[in-house]
Amino acid sequence: MTIIVTGAAGFIGSNIVKGLNERGETNIIAVDNLTRAEKFNNLVDCEIADYLDKTDFVARFARGDFGNVRAVFHEGACSDTMETDGRYMMENNYRYTLALLEACLEQGAQFLYASSAATYGASTMFREDRDYEKPLNVYGYSKFLFDQVVRRRLPSAHSQIVGFRYFNVYGPREFHKGRMASVAFHHFNQFRAEGTVKLFGEYNGYAPGTQSRDFVSVEDVVKVNLYFLDHPEKSGIFNLGTGRSQPFNDIAVSVVNALRESEGKPALSLDEMVQEGLVEYVKFPDALRGKYQCFTQSDVSRLRGAGYSDQFLTVQEGVSRYCKWLLERSA
């Protein structure tokens, strides 16, 4: 049976393709928009059966052109939270996804899609509940609105629908994301170029570098996606984070020590890094005041309740692995 991955040349999509390959799955149709041609690099070491542009895909899928489709992993979207073209965002993230959902329901294909923690916006509670969903930008709203459709459709759906609210994902194959790439990726490049990592200073009662996020490795994101592929009887909207919040200081320390280890140098503590100028704190930008979340932490109770029991990588574990991967490819 065929598996389809949209956004297949992107960050999470290409990691899902690779994860499927590692399970012996190669009958995969990759769907994407390669206007930014460099994204093809994410698929060079992957095995796929075919590639389609996103503009051609939904209509062909709805016609049944691909035969017996087991599942669709829908990772394709505009993920730039700074995008201000609301018409583009809603057409690309909401309307396109809605058409794909309808086709999956019609054909009985499993539908596993990327939602986002951006649906919570200004909330201080990160639980899959309408009361806590307060998106702050049109990206978050596009994801939020589709999640509401899913909630209405789930009671009558005869095939799986699963939405994953990704928190701060980092890991291999994100080179093309530019400013939207993870903090770990930016710290890696900054330290190699400048010999220091810069973090925000004190803000809103948080000491320098202690603003924190639920950072989740793309390795874990893939594992959760594949768990639900194996359990088509499980549907719903689930947070996909670690359930832990770790400070940006932890990312910086993990990156610096991974790079020091590659040079045969001993690990240092945060205080030692600050003393040696390897970690620096800069004034919190005025432009971000009042618009910046100092804390996120996913509530993973619903995910655990669905039977997913694997432990998530810590920042120290995941970032160290990621830096080694980056070093291997930049040698």
Curated annotation (Swiss-Prot):
It is an enzyme of class 5 (isomerase). Pathway: Nucleotide-sugar biosynthesis; ADP-L-glycero-beta-D-manno-heptose biosynthesis; ADP-L-glycero-beta-D-manno-heptose from D-glycero-beta-D-manno-heptose 7-phosphate: step 4/4. Binds 1 NADP(+) per subunit. The keyword Isomerase applies. GO terms for molecular function: ADP-glyceromanno-heptose 6-epimerase activity; NADP binding. Keywords: Carbohydrate metabolism, Isomerase, NADP. InterPro entries: Epimerase_deHydtase (IPR001509), Heptose_epim (IPR011912), NAD(P)-bd_dom_sf (IPR036291). Gene3D superfamilies: NAD(P)-binding Rossmann-like Domain (3.40.50.720), UDP-galactose 4-epimerase, domain 1 (3.90.25.10). Substrate binds at residues 168, 179, 186, 200-203, 213, 292. The active site is at 139 (proton acceptor), 177 (proton acceptor). NADP(+) binds at residues 11-12, 32-33, 39, 54, 75-79, 92, 143, 169, 177. It holds the Pfam family Epimerase. Its cofactor is NADP(+). It catalyses: ADP-D-glycero-beta-D-manno-heptose = ADP-L-glycero-beta-D-manno-heptose. Its EC number is 5.1.3.20. Belongs to the NAD(P)-dependent epimerase/dehydratase family. HldD subfamily. Catalyzes the interconversion between ADP-D-glycero-beta-D-manno-heptose and ADP-L-glycero-beta-D-manno-heptose via an epimerization at carbon 6 of the heptose. Homopentamer. Contains a large N-terminal NADP-binding domain, and a smaller C-terminal substrate-binding domain. This is ADP-L-glycero-D-manno-heptose-6-epimerase. It comes from Cupriavidus metallidurans (strain ATCC 43123 / DSM 2839 / NBRC 102507 / CH34). The gene is hldD.
